[in-house]
């Protein structure tokens, strides 16, 4: 199971193609649209969210509400394209000298300069249009399908904000995945701990007022994954490694940790590892979950807890950073595209869906998965097998 996306930020549309989905998975456009609406929410979003009202068209791979087993194609139209038809059109220009909104000034912290060097673009709009976080809408669409598959398999995934601008939300370990999702969806900053909401919104408002930006930490919590998914045999089959790669592939994410994460460096081994226990009902389990649901690159059967750190968005309104024009080689203060003061709440939704897809991919690789009933039976049989091991 895999997916690819295509499309530019101000182009006609974003497209997602998912290959390897089992047949007979119930799915509707609304299942995906609900996730797209969540991605567009959260305090601190910019004006682009007032323009785009993301909805998906399912153009192949589904018939009468069920997947066929063939590639699933999803399209999200860019409403803003009507204002960019001349700039982003696919046909050659009769007079290239009349090209508008040419970008020759790379913005620090963005892909502009590196992408121009790699692909030879003198107009860096060719870079920033694809490297834009607008593409994450297509990734959320893919993840929404994966979440529907995981739910059919008894696995729940929830994402939320853990920290913004150094303001940290308290842990609420008593909450299950659905309760976490409900709380996050009721919060303007998608946080579980309501006592820090006002502090976080004030920090976002202050950053916006000052023309600056702030980052934070997102957390994803997964319940219901059976033990032994992933592998210790080869480095590239370790599931925690694959999850880490998928998280830092999200725009502006610069770090990832599982369980207690980097805190482990400050503790003795006796305070890090999770002791093993067994009972007749559950089989093997851990008495703690400091390692976040992973040992040896495989799931332990405990909840997966993964966090990702998002840097502040580099587009600064009133405090632009210095760069160099690639045509004149003269220094300048970075130009501004529409941007958010804080996109951490929305990023928690993106991270949730990226993690969901990687987990669904791992399950369809490990278990027979041409048909959903076949996949369900294979996983149920495996759960019973390891319970009695």
From Swiss-Prot:
NADP is among the record's keywords: yes
Gene Ontology MF terms in the entry: chorismate synthase activity; FMN binding
Enzyme kind, highest EC tier: lyase
Binding positions (FMN): 130-132, 251-252, 296, 311-315, 338
Binding of NADP(+), residues: 39, 45
One biological process term in Gene Ontology: chorismate biosynthetic process
Cofactor note: Reduced FMN (FMNH(2)).
Keyword terms of this UniProt record: Amino-acid biosynthesis, Aromatic amino acid biosynthesis, FAD, Flavoprotein, FMN, Lyase, NADP
Gene3D superfamilies on file: Chorismate synthase AroC
Description of how the protein assembles with itself and partners: Homotetramer.
Function: This reaction introduces a second double bond into the aromatic ring system.
Annotated protein name in UniProt: Chorismate synthase
Organism: Oceanobacillus iheyensis (strain DSM 14371 / CIP 107618 / JCM 11309 / KCTC 3954 / HTE831)
Gene expressing this chain: aroC
């Amino acid at each position: 199971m895999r997916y690819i996306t295509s499309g530019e930020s101000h182009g006609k549309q974003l497209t997602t193609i998912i290959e390897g989905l089992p047949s007979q998975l119930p799915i509707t456009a609304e299942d995906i649209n609900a996730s797209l609406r969540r991605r567009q929410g959260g305090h601190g979003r910019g004006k682009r969210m007032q323009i785009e009202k993301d909805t998906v068209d399912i153009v192949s791979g589904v018939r009468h509400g069920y997947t066929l087993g063939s590639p699933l194609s999803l399209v999200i139209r860019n409403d803003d394209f009507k204002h960019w038809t001349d700039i982003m059109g696919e046909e050659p220009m009769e007079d290239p000298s009349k090209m508008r909104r040419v970008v020759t000034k790379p913005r620090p912290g963005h892909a502009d300069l590196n992408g121009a060097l790699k692909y030879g673009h003198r107009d860096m709009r060719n870079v920033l249009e694809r490297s834009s976080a607008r593409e994450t809408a297509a990734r959320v669409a893919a993840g929404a399908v994966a979440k529907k598959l995981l739910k059919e398999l008894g696995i729940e995934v929830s994402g939320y904000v853990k920290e913004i601008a150094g303001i940290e939300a308290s842990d609420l370990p008593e909450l299950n995945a659905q309760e976490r999702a409900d709380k996050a969806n009721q919060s303007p900053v998608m946080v579980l701990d309501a006592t820090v909401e006002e502090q976080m919104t004030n920090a976002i408002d202050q950053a916006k007022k000052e023309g600056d930006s702030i980052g934070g930490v997102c957390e994803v919590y997964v319940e219901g994954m059976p033990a032994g998914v992933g592998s210790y045999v080869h480095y590239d089959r370790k599931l925690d490694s694959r999850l880490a790669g998928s998280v830092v592939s999200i725009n502006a994410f610069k770090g990832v940790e599982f369980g207690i994460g980097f805190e482990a460096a400050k503790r003795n081994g006796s305070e890090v590892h999770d002791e093993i226990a067994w009972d007749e009902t559950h089989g093997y389990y851990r008495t703690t979950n400091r390692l976040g649901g992973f040992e040896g690159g495989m799931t332990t059967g405990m909840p997966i807890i993964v966090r990702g750190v998002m840097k502040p968005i580099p587009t600064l309104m009133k405090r632009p950073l210095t760069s160099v024009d690639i045509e004149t080689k003269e220094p300048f203060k970075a130009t501004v595209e529409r941007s958010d003061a804080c996109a951490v709440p929305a990023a928690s939704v993106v991270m949730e869906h990226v993690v969901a897809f990687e987990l669904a991919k791992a399950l369809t690789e490990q278990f027979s998965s041409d048909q959903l009933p076949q996949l369900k039976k294979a996983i149920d049989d495996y759960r019973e097998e390891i319970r009695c091991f």
